[in-house]
Amino acid sequence: LDRDHAMDAMVGTLSECASKCEKRGITLILEAFNTKVDHPGYFLDDPETTIEVIDRVGSSKVKMLYDIYHMQIMAGDILTFLLQHKDSIGHIHIAGVPGRAEPFNSELNYPYIIQEFINAGYSGAFGLEYFPELPDQESLTKTLLYLSQGK
């Protein structure tokens, strides 16, 4: 399928699902992946395309899982995107960029990003989705300490 047909198929299928989800109080979450490093050939690899799909479906029960790791690789401009589309985001994943390790080993200032997003009214969850380079307990302890710096 070319991109336009793939987009139409995705929107059509999600529209059918969304009407069922609305009746049951379920929210569908779409995640875009990066195709530069981890998922070559994946269709949904751009944050703006993901928002386009959500807008075309037109349901409050279809939202974006914004994986900051993937979207920093694909598009950058993380905070601007998050603030512009906060009402379309249902969940956020955090990992260090590059390498997908602990967030404190990253080119991004996660405490600042998280605090700005909370200040803008985001009340959803932030999930840690990374490959630890440290032993699990040490990794989590250092990550939580680092992320709490913005509070």
Predicted ranges, named:
Residues T27, L44-Y66, H70-K151:
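Histidine-acidic metal/acid-base catalytic patches
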Residues L1-K63, I73:
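Active-site acidic/histidine proton-transfer and metal-coordination neighborhood
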